Amino acid sequence: MNKFILTLAAVLLSMAASADNSTKTYTVTVAYDGTKAVVTIPDAIAGYVSNLNGESSHVKLLQSSTSTQNPGEIIYSLSGQSENGEFYFTGEYKMTMLLNGLTLANPDSSAVHIKDGKRIKVSMAANTVNTLSDGVADSTSKGCFHCKGHTEFAGKGTLNVSSSFNHAIYSKEYVEVKNCTINVTGAKKDGIHCQQYFLMSSGELNINGVEDDGIQVELKDTVQTGILKDHEDENSGNFYMSGGSLSINNLGGYCIKTVGSIAFSGGKQLFDTNNIKDYATTAILQPRTTLDDAQSPVQVYDLQGRRMPHDAMLPRGIYIVKEGGKTRKMTMK
């Protein structure tokens, strides 16, 4: 009996240790100072994170974590100042980037480039001001802040960002904004350019002095999902604003341009709401399968109630789209 009790106790202790490790949070710190940066990686995660560029201010980190082998989500805390540096990150697992009083400029490319298709949380530490800027054009970069994954901006601090050659903020997937303050102070192209959808629920977003659109939302794939519950895995090309304050001024294009719909359900719209463009490309009419018109999951009608063929090239006008039990308006311009 005593042997059984000891064995059981050992198993329970092992399980508790494993559970504690799965919930433990590890932080990698990156402190910029001119042309150098000190990267500190905790020993416990040294097998998952590699510093590829030594003490250079052009920081390049590789995270080998995967969905099945990982120490939990890792936080990357960035602070300090460099007029000739960058943060280049490659990984395959969700991560958090904490901006903790950072001023970072890269004269050659993006200030921040994240090659990770998972959820990327960008948190501004409370009461901090963080500034990102870029330099000359780089064929691999589409923005001063360039992210491959789902980009969620949050926190109680401020982020200032500008681009001299492309978009200020570029995300290959969706962008969400809450709580934080983001100031786009200039861009050669769009202020924010993203795919899938854009959602602002709180916080403050100010876009000024961009040469193209304030915010542009595209599809990630040619096939739309329509609106999904909680927007998870949504690929609609839609823009949503339910709270916060959005200011857009001094631009060369539309304040907001989407391939889906634009929906304001709350917040303050401090821009010309007539200078917006929402439309669907003809790709929305392409069937997802080989179904005929009667079975097509996307149904499009004109204002006279006439059903449009799924492969039709629509003329300018307003149409009603029915998909997945939902109905929305589509404007062809």
Give the predicted meaning of each segment.
Residues N2-L8:
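Sec-dependent signal peptide recognition
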Residues A9-S18:
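Hydrophobic h-region of N-terminal signal peptides that target proteins for export
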Residues A10, T27, P297-Q299:
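Detector for intrinsically disordered, low-structure N-terminal pre-sequences
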Residues A19-D20, G305:
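Bacterial Sec-dependent N-terminal signal peptides
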Residues L285-K333:
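C-terminal outer-membrane/trafficking sorting elements
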